[in-house]
């Protein structure tokens, strides 16, 4: 990592090298340590970025597969739990955090962006929650963040099912934005996120954004979600079953998408407001 002491900024970049900057426990510990240092040593904030071609291609699935092959389920649970704790720490940090994205920002990489206060995105940022494409679901807060963004950004009509159906479609089909501009229209980036056309200026622009953000910063308030519950879950599962009858999805696809439907609708409950921690 590097620091700019004159302006009291911290820039996290390339301390631990993984293939395509995949997220693993060492990277997560680095992020947690950075937030702790920034909060306790009065830094203005943190920029997360790198000089590589890709920001982050997702979680280190090789590590997860290795644990699964050994039936090391506790280690796998710990990996998932560490990710959830890390991303929530980014979201509610006492200092502002800016992500400087470029190239592939997939799965866990997209989740990093959605848990930062502002994204300074290179125009050639490819952003998406692609986990369903490899037979799993987003585990580090991507579902709740994307669901909340769709409604907050006014991308769907009001009502409990509009945002749920949109999130189910985008996440369930592993859609990827082909540019930062498209990512904004899809809800992966918001109206406060910024776009840099020149890759060479990305980190510089991110630092300037951080300085602006630090002047009057307060952490975001936790969201609550009004979800359709059992009836919404049944509707989504029915749609998936129709696809299964026509031979368009595999049996495992049904397992994965039903689990996704359970998360996005709040599970077997009536229409109710639930907290982000519940999701």
What function would you assign to each model-found segment?
Residues 237-279:
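C-terminal extensions of enzymes
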Residues 76-79, 84, 88-223:
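Conserved catalytic cores of soluble enzyme domains
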Residues 228, 232-235, 248:
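Conserved small-residue motifs centered on glycine
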Residues 2-8, 12, 278:
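Single conserved hydrophobic/aromatic residue that forms the stacking wall/gate
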């Amino acid at each position: 990592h590097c620091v700019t002491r004159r302006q009291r900024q911290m820039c996290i970049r390339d301390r631990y090298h993984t293939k395509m900057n995949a997220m693993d426990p060492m990277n997560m510990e680095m992020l947690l340590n950075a937030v702790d240092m920034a909060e306790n040593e009065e830094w203005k904030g943190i920029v997360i970025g790198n000089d590589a071609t890709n920001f982050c291609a997702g979680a280190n699935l090789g590590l997860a597969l290795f644990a699964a092959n050994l039936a090391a389920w506790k280690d796998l649970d710990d990996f998932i739990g560490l990710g959830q704790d890390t991303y929530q720490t980014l979201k509610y940090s006492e200092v502002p955090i800016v992500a400087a994205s470029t190239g592939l920002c997939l799965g866990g990489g997209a989740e990093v962006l959605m848990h930062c206060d502002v994204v300074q995105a290179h125009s050639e940022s490819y952003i998406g929650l692609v986990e369903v494409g490899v037979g799993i679901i987003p585990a580090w807060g991507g579902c709740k963040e994307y669901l909340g963004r769709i409604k907050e950004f006014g991308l769907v009509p009001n009502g409990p099912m509009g945002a749920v159906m949109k999130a189910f479609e985008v996440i369930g089909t592993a859609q990827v934005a082909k540019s930062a501009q498209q990512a904004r229209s899809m809800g992966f980036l918001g109206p406060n996120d910024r776009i840099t056309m020149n890759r060479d200026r990305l980190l510089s622009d991110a630092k300037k954004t951080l300085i602006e953000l630090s002047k009057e910063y307060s952490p975001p308030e936790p969201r609550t979600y009004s979800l359709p519950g059992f009836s919404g879950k049944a509707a989504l599962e029915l749609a998936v079953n129709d696809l299964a009858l026509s031979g368009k999805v595999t049996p495992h696809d049904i397992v994965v998408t039903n689990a996704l439907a359970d998360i996005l609708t709040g599970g077997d409950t009536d229409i109710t407001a639930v907290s982000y921690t519940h999701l």
